[in-house]
Design a protein with these regions (language model features):
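Double-stranded beta-helix
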Residues: 7, 139-145, 151-209
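Short, surface-exposed loop/helix-turn segments at secondary-structure junctions
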Residues: 50-56, 121-131, 175-186, 216, ...
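A structural signal for short, well-ordered beta-strand segments
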Residues: 105-107, 146-148, 220-224
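Short edge-strand/loop segments of extracellular domains
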Residues: 110-111, 163-169, 223-229
Length: 276
């Protein structure tokens, strides 16, 4: 992270990294999704994410994608590559330290009219897995998300939204504000071109605005934790253990369970320093 990126992330709690993915990587992700549409599950009404919000209501629930790391080849390959992407790893080393690990991942598909997601998280939450601190001259985070934009998310489209700076807030956001039913000018819809990565701390108050664009929103969310911590109950995505030998040393390092001593680590340039 350069000086400007550090300042922006510390101030806002998120950062957009443009062109994190190449055109080829982007095409491979979209091709994989196109060939596995049967893996998408649209949320039924009883699992709605919009709560009691009037503003976030939609015509249908969000589409969720799971299991990308174990899809048949070649469709799993682009998502395995993203695990330890050379552009992203240096950011994770800065925010989570050199022994970071994958906590969990999933994909999001939103078509025109898909509901939004109530804003959640924030600096007031007493959660030992969702935190943001500045310590000894460096930022450090708990659970941190890398949301890869597989399609464009332009102005007014909807999608990822947050309250910038709320990762350091001292007051909880009022309920009608996180429902987006009252606008006091603090919520931002974050624009991201396809191929961009939105990196944010889960300590940030964030959620999703209803999708209003004619094209689908496609986003793949990789959620990482510091090496000794876990948020998810399980340590590996379902089915991965059986095919772990197919992953590269860098990918296997990131799939390690939570522990502290003698973890495989990455240098600030993203190079694996200690292989398993």
């Amino acid at each position: 992270m350069d000086l400007y990126e550090k300042y922006f992330f510390d101030l806002n709690g998120y950062l957009v990294v443009p062109d994190a993915l190449t055109a080829d990587e982007l095409a491979q992700c979209n091709d994989a999704i196109n060939n596995n549409t049967d893996q998408m599950r649209e949320r039924p009404e009883e699992k709605s994410l919009s709560g009691e919000s009037r503003t976030l209501k939609g015509q249908q629930g969000r589409g969720d994608l799971d299991g990308m790391l174990t899809w048949p080849r070649p469709w799993c390959d682009p998502f395995r590559h993203l695990l330890a992407h050379p552009v992203i790893v240096p950011y994770l080393v800065e925010l989570l330290r050199d022994g970071f690990r994958l906590d969990h991942l999933y994909g999001i598909i939103m078509r025109l009219g898909t509901e939004g997601h109530v804003l959640h998280g924030g600096g007031t939450a007493d959660d030992l897995t969702h935190f943001y601190q500045y310590h000894n001259g460096r930022m450090r985070c708990g659970l941190t998300v890398v949301a890869g934009a597989v399609t464009d998310c332009g102005p007014g489209d909807g999608g990822f939204a947050c309250i910038p700076g709320s990762h350091k807030s001292n007051y909880p956001a009022p309920r009608d504000v996180i429902l987006l039913d009252k606008d006091i000018g603090v919520v931002t819809q974050v624009e991201a071109k396809a191929g961009s990565a939105i990196i944010f701390t889960e300590a940030l108050t964030h959620g999703t605005m209803p999708w209003k664009a004619s094209h689908d929103r496609r986003s793949i969310l990789y959620k990482y934790s510091p090496g000794p911590l876990t948020y998810a109950k399980t340590y590996l995505p379902q089915g991965v253990e059986a095919v772990l030998d197919e992953f590269t040393p860098e990918q296997r390092a990131i799939l390690e369970p939570p522990y502290r001593p003698n973890r495989p680590t990455f240098a600030t340039d993203g190079i694996l320093r200690q292989a398993i």
